[in-house]
């Protein structure tokens, strides 16, 4: 309930840097243990900001595991979640045991058939109703998802499963 969140840390740092209460919205939520790269968010402030100065001040106030890459002006109607046309998830599967990356990858002991994985991933492209794959389909805005692409790539000992879709279902 009172757990530390990325959004909470970012909001607190921005409010300290700007001296005002701000509305902060992200382009999506992440489950516990899921890490976001290049997450887009919006912040509405009362005044004009000196972007470089605020960026430096905010990053100095954030813990080491959170970093803001840039601040960009956006129109009044921009909303990080509602304006986004797609989202991308990357699942990392390790083909060998790894001590340093174990929090970020799924280690599969058995050999994987990458060709079969690629063929299966390609079948996910298109418009599908995923209602059967979520716990509470009635709480979803829509269980119909447009999967732009699903690809399996190799990167050394890692397999990267990259899924780009209109949205993803909550549980």
Regions found by a protein language model. Name each.
Residues 1-171:
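Structured-RNA-binding interfaces characteristic of tRNA pseudouridine synthases
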């Amino acid at each position: 309930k009172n757990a530390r969140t990325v959004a909470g840390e970012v909001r607190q740092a921005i409010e300290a840097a700007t001296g005002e209460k701000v509305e902060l919205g992200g382009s999506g939520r992440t489950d516990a243990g899921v890490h976001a790269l290049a997450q887009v968010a919006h912040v509405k402030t009362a005044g004009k900001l000196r972007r470089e100065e605020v960026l430096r001040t905010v990053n100095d106030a954030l813990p080491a595991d959170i970093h803001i890459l840039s601040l960009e002006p956006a129109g009044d109607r921009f909303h990080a979640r509602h304006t986004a046309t797609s989202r991308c998830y990357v699942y990392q599967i390790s083909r060998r045991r790894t001590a340093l990356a174990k929090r970020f990858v799924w280690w599969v002991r058995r050999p994987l058939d990458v060709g079969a994985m690629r063929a299966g991933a390609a079948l996910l492209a298109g418009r599908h109703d995923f209602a059967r794959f979520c716990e509470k389909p009635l709480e979803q805005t829509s269980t119909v998802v447009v999967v732009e692409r699903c690809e399996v790539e190799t990167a050394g000992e890692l397999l990267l499963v990259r899924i780009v879709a209109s949205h993803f279902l909550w549980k």
